[in-house]
C-alpha cells in the first residue's frame, strides 16, 4: 500500500472515530456524568457569532460513551435537566468533571465544526 492510500485510510479511520448517536425518538433522555458546560461562538455552529451552550460528558449505560449535545435551549437548575435543540433532555448527574472519552469527542466535535471560539463556563453556569 502506498503513502497516498495510507493517508486516505488514516483520514477515514479518524472520521469514523466519532459517530452519530441514536435518534431522539429512540433515546429521548440521557444522563451525563463527569460533565462540563461550554460556550461556543463562531465556526460552523454559529457563523453569526451568537453563543451556543453545550454539555460535554460521559453517558453511562450498556454502551457508555463520550457525548457532546446539540445547543442547549432551556435548563432547569433544580432538576439539572436541559433540553437541547434536537429535543433531547440531558440530566447532569453528580459533580462536574473530566472524562477522557468525552474530551476526545469534544475535541473532534470542535475540529469538525470549524474550531470555534470556546469557553468553559461550568463553574459560572446559572443553576448548575
Predicted regions and their residues:
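Cysteine-centric segments in proteins
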Residues: 2-81, 88-128
Amino acid at each position: 500500500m502506498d503513502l497516498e492510500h495510507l493517508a486516505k485510510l488514516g483520514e477515514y479511520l479518524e472520521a469514523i472515530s466519532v459517530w452519530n448517536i441514536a435518534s431522539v425518538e429512540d433515546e429521548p433522555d440521557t444522563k451525563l456524568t463527569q460533565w462540563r458546560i461550554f460556550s461556543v461562538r463562531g465556526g460552523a455552529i454559529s457563523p453569526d457569532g451568537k453563543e451556543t451552550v453545550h454539555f460535554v460528558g460521559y453517558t453511562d449505560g450498556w454502551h457508555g460513551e463520550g457525548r457532546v449535545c446539540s445547543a442547549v435551549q432551556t435548563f432547569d437548575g433544580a432538576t439539572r435537566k436541559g433540553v437541547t435543540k434536537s429535543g433531547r433532555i440531558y440530566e447532569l448527574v453528580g459533580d462536574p468533571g473530566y472524562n477522557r472519552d468525552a474530551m476526545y469527542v469534544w475535541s473532534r466535535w470542535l475540529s469538525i465544526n470549524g474550531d470555534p471560539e470556546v469557553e468553559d463556563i461550568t463553574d459560572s453556569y446559572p443553576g448548575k
